[in-house]
C-alpha cells in the first residue's frame, strides 16, 4: 500500500515546485483520517481510488462484526431488488383498472339510458303515433278530396248531362229540381259502378270498343227521348185566355178557372236515364285511379267521394236551373214554356249528333 501511494505523494510534492505562485484546485488533498484522495481527473488518482474501494471490500480479521454487517448489507441488496415489483406488471394492473372503470362507466350510461327511455316512452310514443296517424289520415283525405273534385268536373263537363237534366228541371221549384238532379246522379253512379265491376270481372273478354260504340248510340237515343218528352210537356201547358171585355170580375174569374199545369213526375224513368248514361267506358276514370292508389283505404275514399261529388254536382246544377226558371216565371210570361222548348231542342239536336257523327268519321261524345 505504501509503495503504491508514494508516486502520488511524490507527484504532489513536485507539482508545487513547478507552480510556486498558483495553487491548483485540481490537486488531490490528503485526508489524515481515511488515507484516501478526493477524485481527480488524473489516471493515477483513478487507480488509487479503485484500490481503496477494493481494500474496503476485503474483510479484516480484526473487525468480524463489521464484516458481518457489510456481508449482510451486500446480501440483502439483491433481496431488496427482488422485492421490487416489475414495472410491466404495474402497467398491466393500471390498464386493467382503467378498463374496469370504462366498463363500469359504460354500464352506468346504458342503465341510465334505459331508465330514461322507460320514463320518456309514455311521453314520446303518443306524439309519434299521432304523427303517423296524421300522415295516414292526410293520405286518404287527399284521395277523398281528389275523388270529389273529379266527380264534380265529370258531371259539369259532360254536355249530355247538362242537356239531359235541363228539360227535367225547368218549371220546378228549387227543391224539386235538386231532387231530380240527385236521383239522376244516383242512377249515373249506379251505371258507372256496374260497368266498373264488369270491367274487373271480365277484363280481357270485355270489348271496350264495341261497348263504347253501342253505349254512345244509346246515350244519343236517350237524349232524343228526353227532348221529345220535354216538348210534349211544354205543349201541354194551357194558353192563357184573353178577355175581350174589360170587366175586372170576369178577368179574375177566368184566371181562377185556369187549370194548373201538370208537374213532371220524379220516378223510375229519371233514375233509368241516369243508369244508361253511366254505362259508358268513361266509368273507367273512377275505377283505374282507385286501383292505382297505394292503399285500399285511399282507393275506397276516392271511389266513394267521386260518386258523392257526382250526385252533389248534378243536384246543384238542377237546383240552379229550377231556381232561375222559377224566378223568371214571375216576371216574364210563358218563360217556362219557352225554356222547356229550347232545352228540349238542344237535347234532341245533341242526341242526333251523337248518333250520326260516327258515320261521318268523328264523334261528339
Swiss-Prot record:
GO CC entries: chloroplast; chloroplast membrane; plastid
Primary residence: plastid
Signal peptide bounds: none
Transmembrane segments: 109-129, 139-159, 182-202, 218-238, 274-294, 301-321, 345-365
Gene Ontology biological-process entries: chloroplast organization; leaf development; plant ovule development
Biased composition (Low complexity): 7-24, 62-77
Membrane topology: Multi-pass membrane protein
Keywords: Chloroplast, Membrane, Plastid, Transit peptide, Transmembrane, Transmembrane helix
InterPro entries, sorted: Chloro_ReproSupport/MetalTrans, UreH-like_TM_dom
Mutant lacking the gene: phenotype: Various vegetative defects, including reduced leaf size, dwarfism, and abnormal cell death. Plants lacking both CGF1 and CGF2 are impaired for female gametogenesis and embryogenesis, and have abnormal leaf morphology with yellow patches associated with an altered chloroplast integrity; this phenotype is rescued by sucrose treatment.
Annotated spans, Disordered: 1-30, 62-90
Compartmental location: Plastid, Chloroplast membrane; Plastid membrane
Tissues of expression: Mostly expressed in leaves and flowers, to a lower extent, in stems, roots, floral bud, inflorescence and siliques, and, barely, in seedlings.
Pfam families reported in the protein's UniProt record: DsbD_2
Transit peptide endpoints, chain numbering: 1-79
Function: Together with CGF2, essential protein which supports female gametogenesis and embryogenesis, probably by securing local energy supply.
Full protein name: Chloroplast protein FOR GROWTH AND FERTILITY 1
Originating organism: Arabidopsis thaliana
